[in-house]
Amino acid sequence: ACDHCTHREVRLRSCGHRGCPRCQQHAATDWLERQRAKLLPVDYFLVTFTLPAALRRLTYRHSRDIHDLLFQIAIDTLRTFGRRHPELEADLAATAVLHTHTRKLDYHPHLHVIVPGAGIDQKNRWRTLKGRYLFNGKALARVFRARVIHGLKQAGFELPERCPSRWVVQCQHVGYGLPALKYLSRYLYRGVVAERQIVAFDPHARTVTFRYVRTRRTGGCAG
């Protein structure tokens, strides 16, 4: 309250919880600024690796181990393709973020990886991609699928009987990278439900009612 007028304003104390949409705004902004400082003057690409529905129950039960495996395999797959790319033949850098839920809060693990179209080759030379095409999404999906299944078997996991032969990996050009970083920063440090989506809360029933927007599903692989 102001001592010189009747104006009053409520300021909530910071709880510091990672699910709090207000507390994590500052952390998201800091992360974005750190990533912005690392941006190179080259074209960037956003590669999304999606785990099929048949493996989601297994992944949910063993999330720590399998999430780590997904990060490792996704990055290794991109580096393999980078070394074989005729224009690059280079080790690619990457920034990877795991998303675990849809807007409906359904468990839907997928990795977003931001990749610069440039790298250092085996002779320590800087190589830059020409154009807006990096990798074929279907080719990435085939290699990613084979490596994930092999990795799960090597780790001793029992796979479901029906595992789809076609997985989805999308690879799209995102300009100089900043739009993709801004997109990821909105989800990286915040909870899965934004404050503006909450409609009602019943403390007795311990239920929360919230709004969500249906996302557009894509059945193909970009590239």
Predicted features along the sequence, with ranges:
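Beta->alpha loop/short-helix hinge microenvironment recognizer with preference
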Residues: A1-G223
